[in-house]
Amino acid sequence: MPIFVNTVYCKNILALSMTKKFKTIIDAIGGNIIVNSTILKKLSPYFRTHLRQKYTKNKDPVTRVCLDLDIHSLTSIVIYSYTGKVYIDSHNVVNLLRASILTSVEFIIYTCINFILRDFRKEYCVECYMMGIEYGLSNLLCHTKNFIAKHFLELEDDIIDNFDYLSMKLILESDELNVPDEDYVVDFVIKWYIKRRNKLGNLLLLIKNVIRSNYLSPRGINNVKWILDCTKIFHCDKQPRKSYKYPFIEYPMNMDQIIDIFHMCTSTHVGEVVYLIGGWMNNEIHNNAIAVNYISNNWIPIPPMNSPRLYATGIPANNKLYVVGGLPNPTSVERWFHGDAAWVNMPSLLKPRCNPAVASINNVIYVMGGHSETDTTTEYLLPNHDQWQFGPSTYYPHYKSCALVFGRRLFLVGRNAEFYCESSNTWTLIDDPIYPRDNPELIIVDNKLLLIGGFYRGSYIDTIEVYNHHTYSWNIWDGK
């Protein structure tokens, strides 16, 4: 056990030992100890006050007092008062610090703090942080605050159980707070409020003071509106937290510049939010993702995927964002949504696929094509299942087709076209597009199914086609 010596105090010990000795029995938490009260009263004002002997005509040679200190910490302080030496290790340092603060023994206070800062451990960071606030120990407070912010996800349960409004605010307003996105902070504050049953006023103050609303998803914004009981939330122009700040994005940067960075990415959308996933950056495949709200014209952070991806496909389903296939791991699948700590790996596809067509009906995810130019297999994943299953084969291979659900049917269109009906579990042929296409897109405009874009034999197809559900055929769209 490390020993720390107060050399100045040691010089005065000999003089103290020559004074008249008065024995005192101290009853502490967990035991008692007999001390030389004369020496101990010289140590600090606390002991002078608490060991003061009441005046009587016949003084007893031994007095007895009760102190609200644990016996182990008190013993260490008594040994220090006799020898000028204090024994500190990771097991006793926190309790000894608290006892030395209560007893005003400055050498032990600063020695304990220095020991904690040099050999900092996660298991006592929350308690040290609380002491830093309670007793105004600025260096301990600063160090523990930064540590908790950095390890926030690991310490979440301890924080909820122990922190009041002030303790929480100091952590959550930090730029160093290590969270995957700002929605996570909103979800955490709600959990803290429910668990701790704090006053609603504290919750409102916390939301207004710490949430960076300009980086919230629509889901996060709706949660804040619900808390604040309003239709419009406060404006915030703070910089993003360091944990979800993109190193390749300069601030401020407009949406067009951000979109240009995500070259050859996968894209999908939920409402007004477009998700840009993976692609090619700095001459390599990357695992970055970002969301862009084209209504509010701001970007929303997304944590990096578990795997880099090029030629993958994204699809919203089951209130999550799924990313399927692509290089370099064409059978891999993962999912995430705002407020989640990280992407979660899902069951692997039965076949490797790049740029597959993916759609979801009733929370069942269907994957078609993307394997080879002759492959007609399909596979699907049921909610809460851990394995993909083969579905009914398509009539045509769909190596570079696209898929979209329209009118309770799953349309699969590229060079050829067909649709899937879930109730009958069958594919039905429809007329091929007027202009066959590779990698086109299907969109819905005014309750019409439109086929746009794509390439054929190296040329871009700029003609838009509209589906006629009466004739099962395609017509050139005139914009009406």
From Swiss-Prot:
Keyword rRNA processing among UniProt keywords: no
Pfam families linked to this entry: BACK (PF07707), BTB (PF00651), Kelch_1 (PF01344)
Start-end of each Kelch repeat: 273-319, 320-363, 365-408, 410-447, 448-480
Induction details: Expressed in the early phase of the viral replicative cycle.
InterPro entries, A to Z: BACK (IPR011705), BTB/POZ_dom (IPR000210), Kelch-typ_b-propeller (IPR015915), Kelch_1 (IPR006652), SKP1/BTB/POZ_sf (IPR011333)
Highest taxon, organism lineage: Viruses
Domain BTB: 10-90
Keyword Iron in annotation: no
Keywords for this protein: Kelch repeat, Repeat
Gene3D superfamilies in alphabetical order: 1.25.40.420, Kelch-type beta propeller, Potassium Channel Kv1.1, Chain A
Domain BACK positions: 125-223
Family: Belongs to the orthopoxvirus OPG047 family.
General function of this protein: Might have a role in the suppression of host immune response.
This protein's name: Immune evasion protein OPG047
Organism of provenance: Vaccinia virus (strain Copenhagen)
Phylogenetic lineage: Viruses, Varidnaviria, Bamfordvirae, Nucleocytoviricota, Pokkesviricetes
